[in-house]
From Swiss-Prot:
Protein name: Ribosomal protein uS12 methylthiotransferase RimO
Cofactors, names only: [4Fe-4S] cluster
NCBIfam families linked to this entry: 30S ribosomal protein S12 methylthiotransferase RimO, MiaB/RimO family radical SAM methylthiotransferase
Main function: Catalyzes the methylthiolation of an aspartic acid residue of ribosomal protein uS12.
UniProt keywords, alphabetically: 4Fe-4S, Cytoplasm, Iron, Iron-sulfur, Metal-binding, S-adenosyl-L-methionine, Transferase
Binding site for [4Fe-4S] cluster 2: C150, C154, C157
Length: 438
């Protein structure tokens, strides 16, 4: 179909799960010409994030900036989590927006634009294999969302209040999507959800993610993959073993523990324990060439100095390859919202101390890759002189990047899988030479 003589600027905020929904909207708006310049766009579509306070502020500021910069007659649309979470008041709070829609109508965005109407469907949208997507950012990597929503009841998290309960895709639908994406050239994928390790729990199956790994292995279409967002209480030694034994899934373990102290885990309503965390983490560490990422929250209400010191000592001892550190964010409709807060000054001091630990071990993780062959994915050209790549175990964007100098190559590189040797690194960037494709 011929493209309309109209330009679309889509701004996707927040997580990779949001990005998949943004790509579905691009699939519905394929007849628009894409632009990164909001000032020249005829439609500005902002897929918002409403997870924590800083994300909400970023979404609001992005909307206000677009409203200020847009040309006369441009349609300004706010979709996604922020719109959904505050749907009852957001129309009055941000009147500059022409169309509001939440997390249930990504596949109807073309209709909403045509009718210029707001819509908030009750059912949370979950992309299926038949939903056309425009994959962004890479010609060889794609995200695959396996479920929506979450059945956990963490004290600090508002996500279930606007994303609903766990809703898993059928395994056959995921396999069909993987097959279709591979035919389009996407040979590396990252499987994502709010709680990936609970995949198919809502359908009465406790080993859903193991089933998925086994089915992908048998399909033999993908070259490489990894899984994000394992939840401790639904992660098992059997799941770790399935990842370890897979020829396709990398030994990449992303499991947000949030804390290590038993008393804090209880306050956070994490439905897990220090002993269970240690059992899983030690099993992950024993996997050959494993890469372990986690997330912690600092300053949750009632976190005392002893609990913080216990966390600090553990993080220094365990040595995560990557660690996200978040300050507690008080969110409406959560158990922790009304509890007595830890002073911000104390939270900031604790974060500073933990950042020092995290950066030390991140530095060592990079250093361990130097001067030895590793498997990597070359994705695209970065500027005029370098190709951008990443360790196959790494997730896109968050774990670092590798640059390959094109002046050291005899022929240009095509996106794909290569064996490389990193020789130096600085500021989360490795410099490497290519040995050969594999």
């Amino acid at each position: 179909m011929q493209k309309e003589n109209k330009q679309l600027c889509l701004i996707s905020l927040g997580c990779s799960k949001n990005l998949v929904d943004s790509e579905v909207m691009l699939g519905k708006l394929y007849n628009y010409t894409l632009t990164n310049d909001a000032k020249s766009a005829d439609v500005i579509l902002i897929n918002t994030c409403g997870f924590i306070e800083s994300a909400k502020q970023e979404s609001i500021q992005t909307i206000l900036n677009a409203a200020k910069d847009k040309k006369e007659g441009t349609l300004l649309i706010a979709s996604g989590c922020l719109s959904e979470r505050y749907k009852d008041e957001i129309k009055e709070l941000i009147p500059e927006v022409d169309i509001f829609t939440g997390v249930g109508d990504y596949d109807k965005i073309d209709i909403l634009i045509a009718k210029k109407q707001n819509q908030f469907s009750e059912q949370v949208f979950l992309s299926e294999h038949y939903n056309a997507r425009v994959i962004t950012g890479s010609s060889v990597h794609a995200y695959v969302k396996i479920s929506e929503g979450c059945n956990q009841k963490c004290s600090f998290c508002a996500i279930p209040s606007f994303k609903g309960k766990l809703h898993s895709r059928e395994l056959d639908s995921i396999l069909k999507e993987v097959e279709d994406l591979v035919l389009k050239g996407y040979k590396d994928m990252t499987f994502i959800a709010q709680d990936s390790s609970s995949f198919l729990y809502d359908k009465g199956q406790k080993d859903g993610l193991i089933q998925l790994i086994s089915a992908i292995d048998k399909q033999q279409a993908l070259r490489s993959a990894r899984i994000l967002y394992l939840y401790p209480s639904s992660t098992t030694l059997e799941l770790i073993g399935a990842i370890e034994n897979s020829p396709i899934f990398q030994n990449y373990f992303d499991m947000p523990i949030q804390h290590i102290s038993d008393s804090m885990l209880k306050k956070m309503r994490r439905n897990s324990s220090q002993a269970h965390h240690l059992k899983l983490l030690n099993a992950m560490k024993q996997v050959q060439e494993s890469f372990i990422r986690s997330t912690i929250i600092v300053g949750h209400p009632e976190e005392n100095e002893g609990e913080f010191e216990e966390l600090s000592a553990f993080l220094d001892e365990f040595q995560f390859d990557r660690l996200n550190i978040f300050a507690f964010s008080a969110e409406e409709n959560t158990h922790a919202y009304s509890l007595e807060k830890v002073p911000k000054k104390i939270i900031n001091a604790r974060i500073k101390a933990l950042n020092k630990i995290a950066l030390k071990h991140q530095h060592n993780s990079f250093k361990a890759l130097l001067n030895k062959p590793i498997k990597a994915l070359v994705e695209n050209k970065e500027g005029e002189y370098f190709y951008k790549a990443r360790d196959l175990r790494w997730a896109p964007e968050v774990d670092g990047e590798i640059l390959i100098n094109d002046s050291e190559l005899n022929t240009p590189l095509k996106p794909g899988h290569y064996t490389i040797v990193p020789s130096a690194f600085k500021d989360n960037i490795l410099l490497a030479k290519v040995l050969s494709p594999f």
